[in-house]
Design a protein with these regions (language model features):
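N-terminal localization/anchoring segments of enzymes in phospholipid and broader phosphate metabolism
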Residues: 1-193
Length: 193
């Protein structure tokens, strides 16, 4: 897992700081994101800030470790969490929290006289705004940093009814990577209808 992190994962990770000098970054819809709370000392006073690290969607969700007659699937987020200090040298890490947001993807098309000519342009414009749509759901692992949660709730004006604490793997759809694995194809597993 060390070499996989160093050669494959690490080059794809980009920390995005939010503090007095850096604006709030645009976090992508449905991507797993780490909120890393760090602490520095400024004039003798501790200063906390949050940095976001999104897990690129082109990475496989599980890293496979082959041991004799079995395969161990390690969630990619656990490898990143294990090595997150590599991104934050000489800084105290207070907490590392995984979360995922869902943005509002609804849009309506306006009717016009020349619908055919405008249709493609209007779809392109609407899809661009969709990336910046309002956050309507926040899924977070248990025991998140209250400092980070306060920032996220204020930034997205999201109430507790739309914040979901997940006590297991975030985004269970990722389990299809295991179900569809070549070792299990002929074992009699059936996808639900």
């Amino acid at each position: 897992a060390d070499s996989y992190f160093k050669n494959t994962i690490f080059p794809l990770l980009t920390p995005m700081v939010f503090d007095n000098y850096h604006g709030f970054p645009l976090l992508m819809n449905q991507l797993l994101t780490f909120g890393v709370v760090t602490r520095t000392t400024d004039e003798g006073k501790p200063q906390d800030r949050v940095t976001f690290v999104q897990i690129p969607q082109n990475l496989a969700r599980f890293y496979e470790i082959n041991r004799k007659d079995k395969i161990i699937f390690v969630p990619i987020e656990e490898i990143i969490r294990w090595k997150i200090k590599k991104l934050f040298r000489n800084v105290e890490i207070v907490s590392v929290n995984l979360f995922r947001i869902t943005r509002n993807g609804d849009f309506t098309l306006e009717e016009s006289d020349d619908l055919e000519a405008d249709f493609v342009q209007e779809i392109k414009a609407k899809l661009k705004t969709r990336k910046k749509g309002r956050v309507v759901r926040l899924e977070v692992e248990r025991n998140p940093s209250q400092f980070m949660m306060r920032i996220l709730k204020e930034r997205w004006t999201i109430d507790n009814a739309n914040v979901f604490t997940i006590n297991s793997l975030l985004d269970l759809r990722a389990l299809w990577q295991i179900v569809n694995h070549r070792q299990f194809r002929d074992k009699g597993f059936k996808k639900p209808a």
